[in-house]
Amino acid sequence: MARIPECTILLLLCMCVLAVPAQCFNLQPCVLVNETVSVEKEGCPRCLVFRTTICSGHCPTKEPVYKSPFSVVNQHVCTYGNFRYETIRLPDCADGVDPLVTYPVALSCECSLCSMDTSDCTIESVEPDFCMSQRLPVYESQKPSLYDY
């Protein structure tokens, strides 16, 4: 019986792994998710934490084998398709500080280029509910309106 070299077996295993589509790795597609986020502002001593809808998940992407200095690689990210803006009032702000903060709420998601107008396009950022000041929890059903203060 002919002996198969170890490098041939290794090559076959690598080819099998590369041939497996991304769906087999249980990568969540780009979808709407409910997420706890925080808002804070200089001059307001508390960080307001609440739940809202954001986009999260995996987008198919291609990485070229040959990278030319003249080619442009556009990576698609999971971002807002449609959205609306909501405004929330931060409590206990100093005199002269506008207590209103406006933020986007995702209505639909899509895989497209990242827009700095609505998204954090950094490679690695802080968690969405990160606070530098004292946390003031507000839950989805208790989110204050503009007129609660």
Swiss-Prot record:
Family annotation (Pfam families): Cys_knot
Compartment list: Secreted
One GO molecular-function entry: hormone activity
Chief place where the protein resides: secreted
Disulfide bonds: 30-78, 44-93, 47-131, 55-109, 59-111, 114-121
GO cellular-component term (any): extracellular space
GO biological process, one term: G protein-coupled receptor signaling pathway
Keywords linked to the UniProt accession: Disulfide bond, Glycoprotein, Hormone, Secreted, Signal
Signal sequence, start to end: 1-24
Record SMART domains: GHB
List of glycosylated residues: 34
Purpose of the protein: Involved in gametogenesis and steroidogenesis.
Assembly behavior: Heterodimer of an alpha and a beta chain.
Entry similarity comment: Belongs to the glycoprotein hormones subunit beta family.
Protein name stated in the entry: Gonadotropin subunit beta-2
